[in-house]
């Protein structure tokens, strides 16, 4: 039994295999022949955070592959009343063949995987967003024809998206430069991981450095879910850390831009026209 809790738990070959399978499933879907690999399987979608794209893509994808996806709002479950995560995990594991869990604490996803007895996939935590980044890598490869050797830049908050992008891009042989203000660096263990890649990774406070010569640029929200009280301070701290026409001019002419949305003020309107969302 395997879980997908963070990208660093995978090998580069495993990531490539996932992308290859996803490409084939996409081809089959366009041809009108969805594979039914989940026929007779029940998947729990346990969400403790708001979601539009993650929930929608999972529910539709599970349905197209013949499975049953059950949306479970954590706010409506006994876990909201203090039930230990291990008890919830054991119960869900008896009914479902796999569980996707979207929540705040990475430790809660880890605990669910430890006690459920079925495969667990992270639908996002405050530490990582592996599904989003696998999809990002799939999109980059589709538009660029490859991953290895590309230059990727990230401008914004060194939070969950940045953590997973650093790991995923470096494992795929890409150069990665992240620009974030002081006090908003990626997690210490992710930076330790990135050091193994030497000059292929750079951390800076200068957004233009991340954009210069980039094949693909990523950004993210400045205020993630659960941080709403910090909105005004973060707007001040991240002033200038956006993708606009001047910054895009530093990237390669065929650079693509990816944002997990909501995009709001992090990306200018002209840049939106070049975005692959």
Question: In which residue ranges do the predicted regions lie?
Answer:
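Short, conserved loop/helix-junction motifs that constitute active-site signature segments
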Residues: 171, 246-254
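Anion-binding alpha/beta catalytic cores of soluble intermediary-metabolism enzymes, centered on
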Residues: 90, 97-168, 259
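Active-site cofactor/substrate anionic-group-binding motifs, chiefly glycine-
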Residues: 42, 47-95
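A short, aliphatic-rich alpha-helical micro-motif
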Residues: 93, 113, 210-212, 248
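Positively charged, low-complexity intrinsically disordered leader regions
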Residues: 1-56, 60
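Single conserved hydrophobic/aromatic residue that forms the stacking wall/gate
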Residues: 265-277
